Amino acid sequence: MLQKISQSISLCNGDQFKPLIYLAGAPTNFISSPLSGKKKSSSLRIKRIQQLQSTLEDRINPPLVCGTVSPRLSVPDHILKPLYVESSKVPEISSELQIPDSIGIVKMKKACELAARVLDYAGTLVRPFVTTDEIDKAVHQMVIEFGAYPSPLGYGGFPKSVCTSVNECMFHGIPDSRPLQNGDIINIDVAVYLDGYHGDTSKTFLCGDVNGSLKQLVKVTEECLEKGISVCKDGASFKQIGKIISEHAAKYGYNMERFIGHGVGTVLHSEPLIYLHSNYDYELEYMIEGQTFTLEPILTIGTTEFVTWPDKWTIVTADGGPAAQFEHTILITTTGAEILTISS
């Protein structure tokens, strides 16, 4: 799950923006500096623009609009709830690294496996005419049946148990009465709180007959996540993640959203804040055995500029271009990384 934006956004200098708060997991208290590094080749830029134009021209579905949001669902009293549920304020990001002990790792794995199972189930519901509200209700019911709490519910006032982000929605989509349509893509972001630990994962699903350009965007985004995980191990630099993800996205002319992954464990969002774009100059940090965190790249065909809807959660691309995202929670080992959010 991603972190709520709580500051206004100013768009400037083409496709650059300078938010005071970054979203993918945790806020930072600085204004971004201009992008640096090598620019994409003109051929890739032209290809990307042409692909976006073609995608929008071939689009059979209208732009995303807000539907009706149903009342918040209840959770049985016996289910353990995160502390933030009692407050509408977005929790502070914990500065404590998430390094569970042996008992904690067992609990963490159970939470992550449940999140993965719930996500797999949610994916089976993706088809034309199903509403995202129906998906939310199904996810909510499955989570509480397993004695867990749906982590998004009540996080900073978020009204639903899952995030459903369709087409140009980059993240934080609130489930509502809008039915899915043939040709849509939808990211479903599931996080659960079980026995004191959070598991966090997401995937972009295809709804019906999806055109080739969207299929490729989804495929490359998933590959970016896999490549990011492939460089993770004890002692590795976090900067390697952004470098390999950005390089793979650039090969296809996609824009890499400049948001961040985060530590996860007994709290939903903690240090380290993991930049998934190679152009950030920040203090060098290294991974530690036993550490748990998420990686969650977001790719767009067009701009990474975005617009926040009046609900203060839903984030859509400014040009209406599609976006895709994938996310896993991983555990750092001496030789690599164990993906925890995989269902057995």
From Swiss-Prot:
Positions with a binding annotation for substrate: 172, 269
Cofactor note: Binds 2 divalent metal cations per subunit. Has a high-affinity and a low affinity metal-binding site. The true nature of the physiological cofactor is under debate. The enzyme is active with cobalt, zinc, manganese or divalent iron ions. Most likely, methionine aminopeptidases function as mononuclear Fe(2+)-metalloproteases under physiological conditions, and the catalytically relevant metal-binding site has been assigned to the histidine-containing high-affinity site.
Tissues in which the protein is found: Ubiquitous.
Top-level division of the source organism's lineage: Eukaryota
Function: Removes the N-terminal methionine from nascent proteins. The N-terminal methionine is often cleaved when the second residue in the primary sequence is small and uncharged (Met-Ala-, Cys, Gly, Pro, Ser, Thr, or Val).
Entry-linked InterPro entries: Creatinase/aminopeptidase-like (IPR036005), Pept_M24 (IPR000994), Pept_M24_MAP (IPR001714), Pept_M24A_MAP1 (IPR002467)
Protein name according to UniProt: Methionine aminopeptidase 1C, chloroplastic/mitochondrial
Family in the record: Belongs to the peptidase M24A family. Methionine aminopeptidase type 1 subfamily.
Catalytic activity, EC: 3.4.11.18
Residues involved in a divalent metal cation 2 binding: 200, 262, 296, 327
Organism: Arabidopsis thaliana (Mouse-ear cress)
Keywords: Aminopeptidase, Chloroplast, Hydrolase, Metal-binding, Mitochondrion, Plastid, Protease, Transit peptide
CC terms in the record's Gene Ontology section: chloroplast; mitochondrion
Catalytic class of the enzyme: hydrolase
Entry keyword Manganese: no
Signal peptide bounds: none
Reactions performed catalytically: Release of N-terminal amino acids, preferentially methionine, from peptides and arylamides
